[in-house]
């Protein structure tokens, strides 16, 4: 492929940004930006020795998506780049269709990445300005105003955006010099979407008045990112002290801190666990309604597809969990293991472990996840209400209706892995079972 002098800066940036990347997966939409990036990668491939693959994400949102995927396939075939088209389902949540599509896109790419492979995406300088202004509109702090990082991670894989220092005009000029063909997505004209409105109505006027506006925004984003990195370093030791081996966060350790420091630590705790960054009012609710609620409460705060719970003066970030209270699972343990719902694992008979009496003739076996009333367990003289018993055994509230309960007819025999009731106790010369819960 021919090279001209104006290409040198772009090519050198690609070489520098992808140094050490033996294998690369390009997120390839067929648009201008990713078409330029693919051409650049193919240009430097001969001397770099890098392995390049490309993946098109089929969102199913545009009737032309099939033809776009075919365009991408043909272009990759021409340049001898292995190609995949990945179909995703976009389910709009509170963040809207744009955010949902982005989430689905990155999830698909993360699954598609091979061991040791680096993901490249083609966002440019103007995209950075849009991202910054959208964060400003939301009232984001330095983390949000950091916009997009040139180097970050997607799971355990490096994520590199090598074109962030170049404008769309520069990429367009490159594409025209090399007579590239690319797709124009008609949805990019729809100004109902905030990003398109900024791109078409706001940024051109700002750049016309102040030509260096995108570069200035990029510098501000970098400064915000530096401030966030500094805070990460300064708060690292405090967070390590407050965080427990199971990921829970100590509430008592947060109480004496100033609200500013407390919220900074909460944000970093959530970020470390992969949660979407909460708005300021959500952080305040987290503290007021969950952390600082009365001691006997069992508060819950939903944060997108996660929930924050409190137990024994610690905060836990958990996935949303469907209730299993009404589930009744018939079981014949001697015939086969029992697969539990919601990926909870398997129950099976074993040669060792906690023993319960085998059922008598006429007793049917079932697994349930809820019971009520007073329970008498082996090793205790007096019965306890089941809620009190769970508390005394240190079982977190979210496990109390997800722990398999063994019933014979309507009689509670055991909470598998937790306790055996007097009704399930093995008497002398009685046949017995060892039931084991293998969790996923």
UniProtKB/Swiss-Prot annotation:
Gene Ontology biological-process annotations = tRNA modification
- What are the protein's UniProt keywords? ATP-binding, Cytoplasm, Ligase, Nucleotide-binding, tRNA processing
Listed SUPFAM superfamilies: Adenine nucleotide alpha hydrolases-like (SSF52402), MesJ substrate recognition domain-like (SSF82829), PheT/TilS domain (SSF56037)
Under Enzyme Commission nomenclature, its number is 6.3.4.19
Q: Does the keyword tRNA processing apply?
A: yes
Stated role: Ligates lysine onto the cytidine present at position 34 of the AUA codon-specific tRNA(Ile) that contains the anticodon CAU, in an ATP-dependent manner. Cytidine is converted to lysidine, thus changing the amino acid specificity of the tRNA from methionine to isoleucine.
Name recorded for this polypeptide: tRNA(Ile)-lysidine synthase
Question: What is the organism of origin for this protein?
Answer: Pectobacterium atrosepticum (strain SCRI 1043 / ATCC BAA-672)
């Amino acid at each position: 492929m021919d090279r001209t002098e104006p290409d040198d800066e772009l090519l050198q940036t690609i070489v520098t940004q992808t140094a050490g990347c033996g294998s690369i997966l390009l997120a390839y939409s067929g648009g201008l930006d990713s078409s330029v990036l693919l051409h650049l990668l193919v240009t430097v491939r001969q001397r770099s020795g890098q392995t390049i693959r490309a993946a098109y994400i089929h969102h199913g949102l545009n009737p032309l998506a099939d033809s776009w995927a075919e365009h991408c396939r043909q272009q990759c075939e021409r340049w001898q780049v292995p190609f995949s088209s990945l179909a995703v389902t976009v389910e709009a949540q509170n963040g809207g269709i744009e955010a949902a599509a982005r989430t689905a896109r990155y999830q698909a790419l993360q699954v598609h990445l091979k061991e040791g492979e680096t993901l490249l995406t083609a966002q440019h300088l103007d995209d950075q300005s849009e991202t910054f202004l959208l964060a400003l509109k939301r009232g984001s702090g330095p983390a949000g105003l950091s916009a997009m990082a040139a180097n970050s991670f997607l799971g355990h894989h490096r994520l590199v955006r090598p074109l962030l220092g170049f404008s769309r005009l520069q990429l367009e000029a490159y594409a025209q010099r090399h007579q590239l063909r690319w797709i124009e997505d008609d949805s990019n004209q729809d100004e109902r979407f905030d990003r398109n409105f900024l791109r078409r109505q706001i940024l051109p006027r700002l750049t016309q008045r102040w030509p260096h506006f995108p570069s200035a925004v990029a510098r501000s984003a970098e400064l915000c990112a530096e401030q966030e990195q500094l805070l990460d370093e300064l708060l690292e030791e405090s967070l390590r002290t407050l965080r427990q081996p199971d990921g829970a966060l100590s509430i008592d350790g947060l109480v004496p801190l100033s609200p500013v420091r407390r919220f900074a630590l909460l944000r970093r705790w959530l970020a470390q666990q992969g949660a979407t960054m909460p708005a300021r009012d959500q952080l305040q609710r987290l503290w007021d309604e969950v952390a600082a609620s009365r001691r006997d409460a069992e508060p819950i705060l939903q944060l997108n597809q996660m929930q924050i719970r409190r137990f024994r003066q610690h905060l836990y970030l958990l996935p949303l969990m469907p209730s299993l209270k009404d589930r009744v699972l018939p079981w014949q343990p001697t015939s086969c293991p029992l697969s539990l719902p919601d990926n909870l694992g398997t129950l099976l008979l074993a040669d060792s472990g906690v023993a319960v009496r085998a059922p008598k003739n006429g007793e049917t076996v079932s697994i349930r996840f809820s019971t009520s009333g007073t329970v008498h367990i082996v090793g205790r003289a007096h019965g306890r209400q089941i809620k009190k018993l769970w508390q005394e055994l240190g079982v977190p509230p979210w496990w109390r209706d997800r722990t398999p309960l063994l019933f014979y007819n309507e009689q509670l025999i055991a909470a598998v892995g937790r306790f055996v009731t007097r009704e399930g106790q093995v008497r002398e010369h009685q046949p017995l079972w060892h039931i084991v819960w293998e969790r996923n």
